[in-house]
């Protein structure tokens, strides 16, 4: 991670165990900010440990959350007695997340929260609780409306696919929903959730189920939590 202003602290959360590999890669780099990596379901409350408990429940492994709950107590400065083993953790971690973060980044994951409205709102509640006033949320995902329109115009109305110059598949998107309209109106929020697509990316080598993101609706719901879209000069 490089930027003009040094990063003072990084909290990295992912529901998958791949976060442990990311932690190792970070540890092996020479320029690394103070960091904490955790396996956590960010569609559940982060601060109170629900996200950790959800992972423990899903993977049937209590050890996944025991250490992480202690780390949460430390970084959110909850006045709890910590085990002796934690005494060597640098003091700068204590309470470092209590006042929130300047930037929250969600790369190629926003679409998963559009499974249903409760899942999305639970995630946005995490953003609201952890982003400082004046801070930024940055996210990356497909434009759901563009994907919807391209699937409508596809020869079989169901599949989009791109191949490279050697005929190897680069990506594919397969429609799994039945909806014929993805237009946002404030009265039809419920109908825009759960619009499933199967996505294959050659760089990952697997197919994952994702959900179309209607940006108009997303912006509207984010505004309820005091987030406003910002156009940055690049």
Label every model-predicted segment.
Residues 43-44, 110-111, 142-147:
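Short "lid" loop at the C-terminus of a central beta-strand within the Rossmann-like core
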Residues 56-92, 158-186:
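Short mixed-charge
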Residues 2-3, 15, 23-26, 49-53, ...:
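Short coil/turn segments at secondary-structure boundaries
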Residues 94-98, 111, 118-136:
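A short glycine-rich, Lys/Arg-flanked "PGG" loop and its adjoining helix->strand segment in the class I
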Residues 105:
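A conserved beta-strand element that flanks and buttresses the S-adenosyl-L-methionine
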Residues 100-102:
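Local beta-strand N-terminus motif with an aromatic residue
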Residues 140, 144-225, 230-234:
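SAM-dependent methyltransferase
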Residues 3-87:
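Class I SAM-dependent methyltransferase SAM/SAH-binding core
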């Amino acid at each position: 991670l490089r930027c003009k202003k040094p990063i003072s602290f990084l909290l990295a959360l992912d529901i998958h165990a791949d976060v442990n590999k990311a932690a190792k890669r970070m540890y092996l780099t020479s320029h690394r900010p103070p960091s904490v990596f955790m396996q956590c379901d960010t569609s559940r409350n982060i601060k109170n440990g629900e996200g950790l408990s959800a992972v423990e429940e899903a993977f049937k492994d209590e050890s996944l959350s025991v250490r992480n709950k202690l780390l949460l107590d430390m970084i959110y400065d909850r006045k709890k007695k910590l085990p002796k083993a934690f005494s060597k953790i640098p003091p700068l971690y204590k309470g470092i997340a209590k006042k929130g973060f300047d930037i929250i980044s969600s790369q190629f994951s926003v679409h998963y929260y559009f499974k249903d409205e409760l899942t999305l709102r639970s995630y946005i509640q995490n953003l609201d609780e952890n982003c400082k006033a004046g801070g930024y949320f940055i996210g990356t995902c497909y434009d759901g409306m563009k994907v919807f329109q391209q699937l409508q115009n596809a020869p079989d109305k169901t599949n989009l696919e791109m191949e490279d110059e050697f005929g190897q598949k680069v990506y594919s998107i397969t429609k799994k929903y039945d909806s014929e309209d993805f237009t946002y109106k404030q009265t039809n929020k419920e109908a825009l959730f759960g619009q499933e697509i199967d996505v294959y990316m050659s760089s990952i080598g697997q197919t994952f189920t994702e959900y179309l993101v209607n940006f108009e609706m997303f912006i509207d719901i984010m505004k309820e939590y005091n987030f406003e879209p910002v156009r940055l000069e690049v």
